[in-house]
């Protein structure tokens, strides 16, 4: 794997002062980031999340997905724990890129679900590659993680890379009328573990 560490700096946020570690995937040219809080290289399991880039949800407050809500909830949880890691992976639109994501949204506006839209554009339902996580975690000295995710594929990917997942921590937040079908599709077609959140129980999003 051609992922190399480039530089690190402090990153003050509303949730605490994190350390931001920058990585470059030399094979793709993509730049990835890890945020850490506290001591994470002591061998004890670290609360963490693998978060794929979502410009619309993370930065533009979109209600079409739950990404922005999950990002905030994960950072809040790490801050409450006092230590943890968040890998921010530049895999926009489940790996299809921003412009193709907008094309997929247009198909969804016409009635397709999130999986059907990707497939009509010639992509797999999920194109993300979590192999980039191993060298990032190795650089940070993390060998065991309590993973905040609803996606069993992330657990399997980390375990397959030799990272011990000691616990899966559900991260269910952000359900609203605009993303109800999207979440139901993630549960029904992508195997995400969303409990009652895809059974028609719509909550008012709070962001945490």
UniProtKB/Swiss-Prot annotation:
Q: Name one GO molecular function term.
A: zinc ion binding
Q: Which SUPFAM superfamilies match?
A: RibA-like
The UniProt catalytic activity note for this protein reads: GTP + 4 H2O = 2,5-diamino-6-hydroxy-4-(5-phosphoribosylamino)-pyrimidine + formate + 2 phosphate + 3 H(+)
Going by the record, the broad EC class of this enzyme is hydrolase
Q: Which cofactor does it need?
A: Zn(2+)
User: What does UniProt list as catalytic?
Assistant: 126 (proton acceptor), 128 (nucleophile)
Entry keyword set: GTP-binding, Hydrolase, Metal-binding, Nucleotide-binding, Riboflavin biosynthesis, Zinc
Single GO BP term: riboflavin biosynthetic process
Q: Which InterPro entries match?
A: GTP_cyclohydro_II, RibA, RibA-like_sf
Listed GO cellular component terms? cytosol
Q: What is its EC number?
A: 3.5.4.25
Positions annotated to bind Zn(2+): 54, 65, 67
Cofactor binding mode, per the note? Binds 1 zinc ion per subunit.
- The keyword RNA-binding belongs to this UniProt entry's keyword annotation: no
* Biological or metabolic pathway of the protein: Cofactor biosynthesis; riboflavin biosynthesis; 5-amino-6-(D-ribitylamino)uracil from GTP: step 1/4
| Record keyword Nucleotide-binding present | yes
Q: Where does GTP bind?
A: 49-53, 70, 92-94, 114, 149, 154
State the family it belongs to.
Belongs to the GTP cyclohydrolase II family.
PANTHER family (UniProt xref): 3,4-DIHYDROXY-2-BUTANONE 4-PHOSPHATE SYNTHASE (PTHR21327:SF18), GTP CYCLOHYDROLASE II-RELATED (PTHR21327)
Q: What does this chain do?
A: Catalyzes the conversion of GTP to 2,5-diamino-6-ribosylamino-4(3H)-pyrimidinone 5'-phosphate (DARP), formate and pyrophosphate.
Tell me the protein's name.
Answer: GTP cyclohydrolase-2
